Amino acid sequence: SIDNIFNNHGISDGKRAEFILRSFIQHKFNIDDITFAELYKLTNKNLLIIGTNFTHAREEVFSHTNTPDMSVITAVRISMSIPVFFTPVLYNNCYYVDGSIKNNFPIKYCNKYTTIGLYVRNNNDTCNNEISSIVSIILGCANIIADTINHKDIHLCDTIIQIDNYKHEMVNFDFTIDTKMKLLKLGHKYAKKFIKDLPRKICIAIINKIIDDVCNFI
């Protein structure tokens, strides 16, 4: 409720999302919760989840190496905690919120030679932020900040499929089937363009690598 914003600093406490996550884990592993260390042992997959430490204003990475005993559900709950919409998460005496506040496109943690990044970008050319409430101001600022962060890190990987002309709000959770199909078609369009341009991208990447090696040798 709106009263929850003033009492607990967010509209939703995220309990429903946690219930859904627990159901998935119960169905997959027949347990109610799972730590990063347990997940890695069972799957041999290195899961990284980004959160923002609001208390100390820094980006943190949750994984089986950094936080082996942390609940994966807690990490996911942190990563989805959009300010105002969800209450912050108290973990290790610090408050945490959505990782996108500090890094909305954490491609830097991936192998840039083997990772394909999908970057769904709002079209700022058609952006028309309006102020109708305190929430609209917060969301507008969050979108601007996130777009700036994205541009800062996007050069770190040559294999990024950038999907432009996306015109939906980041907190629009009520997607219709028609909207989902339009987004899929948009992704297919830009994926084909990416594949067509890939040989040129690879050549440029190789040339840049050679230049870097020569400069380092000199």
Each model region followed by its residue ranges:
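Patatin-like phospholipase
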Residues: 1-218
